[in-house]
Amino acid sequence: MTETEAVKLNDINEEGLIDKNTKNKGLNNKIVYSLFGVIIVLIIAGVILLLLHKNKNDTTQKNADLVTAFFKDGYENKNFDKVLTYMAKDYYDHSPASARSNVDAVNILKTVEKMYSNVTVEMLDLTCQNDMVAARMKFRMVHSGEVSGIPATGKTITFEALENFKVVNGIIVESWGYWPDKQIEEQLKKKNEQY
């Protein structure tokens, strides 16, 4: 680098730019254009990151809404045709219920319908991360059909259940659940107690 190309410390003015009175006016313009280019790139990158974050939040909310709709339509509204559309045809339930398709899952819901009436589901917690949705629900229902050899008692029972769902492209593909079967059975066997 020759002396005419080099920027000397005494050529820089108070604003941090090369003094206009120096021989290096062209270099001053190059710095300004370079800074302008960097600023434009940073703005574009920021906009892209905001859009990606917004899209992730939209997907997370859609996944949460899907899981909520599954419980509301499956247990409360008994809209089984709609529930079929919420799950993949090869839906896989890792819980003891062992549904291996969306049709199996709906058949389980239909079995529950024969045993219980006036079912309400309160979503207590709903946590979403990436393609996973964790739900904690409180069920309240009337025992109106035979369950595990126990004839209908008319009792209202309540219990909490946990369920984790994997959602891909807006469809539930897998689930892992905990249902307190023993607690439910104990409530049904107790005489004249409502829960």
For each of these PLM feature ranges, what is it?
Residues 31-90, 191-195:
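Short, low-complexity N-terminal intrinsically disordered segments enriched in polar/charged residues
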